[in-house]
């Protein structure tokens, strides 16, 4: 509790509104509430988060662990991004029922499509448990033993904290281990697909427009949460009924204007706002360039096949989008960090930090922090780069190698946990890979393998390369693997895993694809991971002390905890920006812009005929504005990955937009937030309603919602 009090006492209530930051919703009273009201907010902090009555937090569930969603009707209807629902849409798609291309709309509840393993998680309460988690930790000197004690305490408090039988407890760390918070949650496992526009709307602009502005993408999809007859979470059942939410968001028909207040709630995944300059230099100069080059090579191969074959396009659409998303983000991030002189600004802060350490007489506690950071980042860099090559080539972007690595992990389970654990893992692996092989094409992956293994062998630090990557003729090596390995089709894969543990391990050891993966994984496990983890543990300990020092030495600064996939609030205004000299981007776009980008037959910029007809007839209904149809808008809200699908609400708490991206120039906000160029991109809710109503003819979904005119009161 003392860190909560310290955190609140650190700040002087400011009369001038500020922006930026990802704030814990249970701690908004005081500085944050004052700032938001100065920006124009009309509701209170208690309206945003409360355990005593319904609040906005009850309408913002975590969507499948990686995105955000919002409840928009009293019947459990939720809204998220098209790209967040993409896997579900793809899984229900086939050549005969191509929902990716044509869209999908359930015209009655009986038509809504169930989705195995898709969950949404609601927050019931947020509780500080710092004292319980850090009990008995201060006297421990070993960093490893300290973390073990913390984990032991987390296990205890998770098990003992009061909750209902259908609820779950989860503890997360904040401020680099200086604060711990327990979330009581409800996880709903019956989530059904209700509607999704065609990809020509939901992914309009695709990879060319990704991370950029102006934008004209209708990036949304709709699902419905189902519960048992007690309104509690339950596995899928035909007897389940639509979930009755504690709160749902009214939808504004009045739209936005520049300088309007906006607030975004969601589950941002990861930020690193308090890194030292040495870490930022490593990102800009070492790790980002390596990851960008690897993914660019994989994307080039996949794109070539997808443009020639529609079946491959369906198979690889979601995978391609996933690879491209962070490839482009890393490019923009690196450019933004350079443009904003983030390294130089960090260095200036570090000079000031050292002076404050001396002035406060804290040399013994904090005097060597920066020198130690420099030492350890210098030591860890070759290991970090090697780690990225292994993860990007083997674990993530070459499918045969990724599958082989799962078998490697299976073998390790047998070695460390025995045959029963092996059998359990094996059965789960066989079952889960059915979907993998449905969307796997060996010809495509062989070419990806050829390109990426060549990069691994020629660009990764030479001192950490295994023998299997030395002196390899890549164009001959790839066919020799793919023509002989049993990891290229489901039937052979299942046969490979038939039998007891010893029989399976013997069979996979003889597979050429697995043998190659094992050589890479053994090398990584022996020569890279241990030393990386050892140094990284020291860096993490330094970062925790560095964070504590900043909280102590900068009591009047706006310090918020880095994102960690927990519910946060960020606020700002609808605002345009200037990316470069003589250019200013307006904060709103219209359907006119999509038509201007229209390229008939192009997979990125084609437009459905019906949408063109609606545009030509200006048939916008109640969703138009001065004869035009709003599509997207931008704001100064501080967002990141995980905020996809987040609701953007107005001053009264009404839904005005759906967050789905950031502008390319500002993607470095994960590391360095610059309010002059950092903008989040949102779909205007009027465009969402227009597509549902006028384009899809799903008026019944509109009728479920509460449409309001807050500006006309």
Curated annotation (Swiss-Prot):
It comes from the Bacteria. Its EC number is 3.4.14.-. The keyword Transmembrane helix does not apply. Residues 1-17 form the signal peptide. The record marks 662 as: Is essential for the Asp/Glu P1 specificity of DPP11. Keywords: Aminopeptidase, Hydrolase, Protease, Serine protease, Signal. GO terms for molecular function: dipeptidyl-peptidase activity; serine-type aminopeptidase activity. The active site is at 83 (charge relay system), 219 (charge relay system), 644 (charge relay system). GO terms for biological process: peptide catabolic process; proteolysis. It holds the Pfam family Peptidase_S46. InterPro entries: Pep_S46, Peptidase_S1_PA. PANTHER family: PERIPLASMIC PEPTIDASE SUBFAMILY S1B. Belongs to the peptidase S46 family. Catalyzes the removal of dipeptides from the N-terminus of oligopeptides. Shows a strict specificity for acidic residues (Asp or Glu) in the P1 position, and has probably a hydrophobic residue preference at the P2 position. Preferentially cleaves the synthetic substrate Leu-Asp-methylcoumaryl-7-amide (Leu-Asp-MCA) as compared to Leu-Glu-MCA. This is Asp/Glu-specific dipeptidyl-peptidase. It comes from Flavobacterium psychrophilum (strain ATCC 49511 / DSM 21280 / CIP 103535 / JIP02/86). The lineage of its organism: Bacteria, Pseudomonadati, Bacteroidota, Flavobacteriia, Flavobacteriales.
